[in-house]
Amino acid sequence: MPHMVALAVGRDPLLLETRGRVLRNAGYTVVSALSVEQALQSFVSRDFEIVILCHSLPRRDRERLTYAIHAHSPNTPVIVVTARVSAMDSFADAMIENEPEILLQEIPRILHQAPEKYQREPKRA
């Protein structure tokens, strides 16, 4: 797998640190953000292959952040990690269970499910 950079966003510092450690141990570079504003600042300052939103963010914040990311970079997938997958956040590209093994299995699948959608293109200015 080529080197991947992920943006992980959530309000719970412990969950965010744990998720970041899991991703780093799997070879990802991880930038973490504790708020929508911090996430947007990070997102516009560098390229990310994927954005991972934690269920600890309120739904309206997940939605707002997803739309902002897709407006800036339509081909960057946004996934929501949740305690239980029952209802899809219709704005997200995927929702997955909050299990490290599932997260690590699903990221490559999401990136390869529609390669033409997620191929890197320059971010909009």
Task: Give the positions of each predicted feature.
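Conserved phosphotransfer microenvironments
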Residues: 53-69
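Non-catalytic signal-transmission and effector/linker regions of two-component phosphorelay proteins
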Residues: 1-13, 85, 100-125
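Conserved phosphotransfer cores of two-component systems
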Residues: 44-46, 69-75, 84
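Conserved acidic segment of CheY-like receiver
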Residues: 3-14, 19-23, 51, 79
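Acidic, metal-coordinating helix/loop segments flanking the phosphotransfer/catalytic sites
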Residues: 32-50
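Conserved dinucleotide-binding and phosphotransfer motif residues
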Residues: 25-26, 72
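Alpha4 helix (beta4-alpha4-beta5 surface) of REC/receiver domains from two-component response regulators
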Residues: 59, 64, 76-105
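Residue-level detector of anion-binding/catalytic polar loops
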Residues: 29
